Each structure stands twice: as structure tokens, then as C-alpha cells.
Amino acid sequence: MEQFKTYALMTGLTLLFIWFGGMIAGQTGMVIAFLVAAGMNFYAYYYSDQQVLSHYHAEPVDRAHASGLYQIVEKLTRRAGLPMPALYIIPEQQPNAFATGRNYEHAAVAVTEGLLDLMTDEEIEAVIAHELSHIKHYDMLIGTVAATIAGAIAMLANFGMFFGSGDRDRPNIFVMLALMFIMPMAASIIQMTVSRNREFMADEGSARMTGHPEWLQSALTKLDNYARSITLPEADPQTAHMFIINPFSGKDVSLKQLFSTHPSTEARIERLEALK
């Protein structure tokens, strides 16, 4: 069922992109948008995981090099009924983590050195359980495709005035200009809403997997505080939604709540409290 929801969302966002192309440049725009969307979805599906791991200089590790982490992940994957994901460590001091990959068999979990150095074993277990919940519900693919299509719509809007069409039913210039401003914002809101809802679901999944909601509450509190004082130099806004805590938490951003990739830490802790 979760895989069906994933592909349904991918299809819906792709159709939105194609429709936007048609509104800007008629049938020609629809064809171009379809080809661009197909190419971007193909790339996102097969290669986005390696791209993001490379961007953060993540190094693969095994049981011999990270036995404690490996044992935690191994225990939780058995409990969740998941295959063992590939494990990576990011050489950064901000405590954080993310999951990536297109399905159960091609999943990876990456944690920073800061997470391993500054968190307790219980907090690390809660964070790993959160990331495994993302894997279980195909959230990595959903987030990747949502970000890809949102970026594509913004790109199409930026170049919208250069598309031409001979179709007589093309909307007037005022409608087209309005769409060029509205559609990228709408796509971003869809992306952020999807991301926030999935964070709540993964938090709940972590609490149920470990049986200790308080472990994740403690982890989220510390992660949020550290994110405000320790930067993640390689952090990219396009991948911020992947992390358990927004790596930009310490920065002031206009319209922060509307366009935040994560619900507030306070809201997440409050929801976890209800699970006790």
C-alpha cells in the first residue's frame, strides 16, 4: 500500500508539471515538460541516493568499523522486518542523520560523527528507528521526487517567457504570469507539507519500534539545540527535508513555518508524549 501511495504521488506531481508546461506553452510545452519530468524522475529514482551521499562525503562502514552502530541497526531491522541497509558515516560534527534509497533492497542510512559522539545509545537507537521508519514507508523516494518536481516547476517558471506556442487557446499573458508565480510556490508547499507529515509518521514509527517515545523526545531536543550552535557546512536546502532535524535550524528564514521542511520540534515532542 505504501509503495502504491509513493507511485501515486510521483504520478500526481509529474502530471502537475506537465499541466504547467501546457499552460505556459501549449502542446509543445506539455511534450517538453513530459520529457523533462521523465528524465528527472528516472534520475531521481536510480541515482539520487548516491548523489546525496557523495555530496555529504559519506563513507560506507561495516560491522568491523562501527560495531556499535551496526548492532543497533541490525537489531532494529529485525524488529521492523526490513533488510539491513547500507550504513554511512558523514564526517561532520552537527548531530544529524538521514535515510535514502529507492526501496528496501537499495536503502542506506547515514549518520554524522557528531551523532555518534554526542548522543547516548538510547538516543541513537531512537534516531535510527526514525530513519528505518522512513525506509519502511518509502519516504526517501517520496521526498526525493517531490523535491525534484518542485525544482523542475520552479525552473520551468523561470524560463516560461522563452517558451513559444502556436496554439490559439494559449492563456493570455496575465494568466501565464500569474501561474509563473503561483505554481512554484504551490509545488513548494506540497513538498513541505508532504515532508512534515512524513516526519510525524516516522517519529511515531520510531516510538513504536523502540517502545520508548522518551528516547526520541530526548534525541530531538538535543538535535535541535545542537543544530542551532553547530553548523553543517555542506548543507543544501534541496536536501534539508531528508534529515531528522533541519540542518538550517539555527538560521533565520522568512516565512519559516510555512516553508519549513520539518514540523517544529515542540510539536513533535508533544505528539510523542501522547504515545506514552
From Swiss-Prot:
Molecular function GO labels: metalloendopeptidase activity; zinc ion binding
Subcellular location: Cell inner membrane
Record keywords, A-Z: Cell inner membrane, Cell membrane, Hydrolase, Membrane, Metal-binding, Metalloprotease, Protease, Transmembrane, Transmembrane helix, Zinc
Keyword Zinc (UniProt): yes
Residues spanning the membrane: 16-36, 142-162, 173-193
Disulfide bridge map: none
Highest taxon of source: Bacteria
Membrane topology annotation: Multi-pass membrane protein
Active site residues per record: E131
Cofactor binding note of this UniProt entry: Binds 1 zinc ion per subunit.
Gene Ontology, cellular component aspect: plasma membrane
Enzymatic class: hydrolase
Family: Belongs to the peptidase M48B family.
PANTHER family: PROTEASE HTPX (PTHR43221:SF1)
HAMAP family: Pept_M48_protease_HtpX (MF_00188)
Name the record gives this protein: Protease HtpX homolog
